[in-house]
UniProtKB/Swiss-Prot annotation:
Pfam families: Peptidase_S10 (PF00450). Keywords: Carboxypeptidase, Glycoprotein, Hydrolase, Protease, Secreted, Signal, Zymogen. This is Serine carboxypeptidase S10 family member 1. GO terms for biological process: proteolysis. Belongs to the peptidase S10 family. It is found in: Secreted. The active site is at residues 156, 338, 396. GO terms for cellular component: extracellular region. GO terms for molecular function: serine-type carboxypeptidase activity.
Amino acid sequence: MMKLLFIIISIIFVINVSNSTPTLQLSGYFNVNETTNANLFYLFYESQNSPSTDPLILWLTGGPGCSSLMAAFYENGPYFVNDNLTLSENPNSWNMVANVLYVDSPLGAGFSYVVDSDGYSTTETEISENLYSFLTQFLSKYPKYSKLPLYIFGESYAGHYVPSFSYYIYQKNLGLATINLKGLAIGNGMVDPYIQYGSLGPFAYAHGMLDINALKETEGLYESCQQAIDSGDYNMTTQICNNIMDIVQEYAGNFNVYDVSKTCYPNEPLCYNFTAIIDYLNLASTKQSFGVLPNSTWNVCSTQPYSAIIRDWFNTPINYIPTLLENYKVLVYNGNYDWICNFLGSTEWTSQLKWKYNQEFNNSPRKILYINGNTISGYSQSYDNLTMQVLLGASHMAPREAPVAALAMVESFIQN
């Protein structure tokens, strides 16, 4: 009986949104490790366009240890949560153009759980193994989605997850191509700290948050940060590299590290007010409809998976990306207001990629992007399988502030 509980699936139609077309929703758990009793939770929304032919997007939120449901109800899902805990329709939901599968990963994030504490993931390989087990079970349970083009999207620390999981699928497909992976996308991602930490000072300086002396101070700290990363001493590296962040915040004040156009207030976790989402997802009725264990508590981010994987922070999956570019499309995008994983850092690591079209990509012309005819929404640079986009007016969670531009970007990427 207990084992059946681990794979319970809840199939419902969302009907409590006025003037909304019901969308097929699937949710529940798949057991990915019987030994540790490890269970990944998912929430799936079928495409509102052409579910039988539209691609499948698998979404991963970073942290590490933050729930993908945060994206589902705050960024790019079909519904937002109102202050009175009702739902309102998102006209720019990504399931307007794709089937979207949100997965709470790694184990312990969101509604996902593991009974044996030894089951928490400590490496990207373990996370990828669990995700692969989950995905193969999902596609087996729902075979009508198994042949659709698959795109893996992720945000923030998912800059580690997305390339690692994509490369894991690539390796598995060398034997027999069972998963129809076509591309991957990294939004405001932390991919290579060795490179990206160097952008924190210059970005703040360019936004008027630092003077020239403070900038020079961050440059000296960045050199020490790189040396610490090279040493392999995690504790020392964390302390030294975090000094860059501390110095910038000391000079610039209590700004929102995810959106430099805003102030971060002490009573807001992660600088945002997620109270309505937290309350909604912890309602007994919500948990019942999702097929979630009644005693589960949903949090935006969880400490146990964070503590388990955090020593992997300064490792980088960047060496996987040249191989991935040989086989799949890769999209890297950033909101221009994000500081913590900013576009300068993304531009730098993409420009340094060791792949055959490095020079051609770096020399390719940048295009201006428009929405609504003549409104500038961002900028794009592309060559062969690699595309880099900057979305104007957007933060760390780019689809929230630039929903129209983000949806257009996704549609262009997955529909060729």
